[in-house]
Amino acid sequence: AFLRKAGADTALVHKFFQHDLRDTVTKMQIIQGAQTYRGSMAIALTDRPVGRAIAGQAADEMLNIAGIEASFVLFPEAGQAYLSARSGSNVNVQVISEMLGGGGNATTAGAQFPGKTTEDVLPLLKETIDNYFDDEA
């Protein structure tokens, strides 16, 4: 309504925000494989390269799941594992990512793991999440 009142072409705006079907299916497949950890963390792992943008969008989307405070997507790219992390306001994914050698900000962060697979990184991620909450207590 705001955009229409401001004179925007809402059909054009809608078209601008549409997603490619293949990318949408890929995001949904990532999300479908997600598991909860510590009750409020969603962790998804994919064994195929999906790109940083798609992984980040899947992590963003998982925050819309009731009870999820932070989300993590592990994916391979160019011979290494990558992490894309997102959160609301209760979990600082920057701190978790920095503990893993990455960075970002409180709500959007990531890390790279040269020479590692996503399966290698998964237990390390869980241990790091545990350490984060132990330090917060």
Model-derived segments and spans:
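Hydrophobic helix-and-loop "lid/oligomerization" segment in the mid-to-C-terminal part
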Residues: 1-137
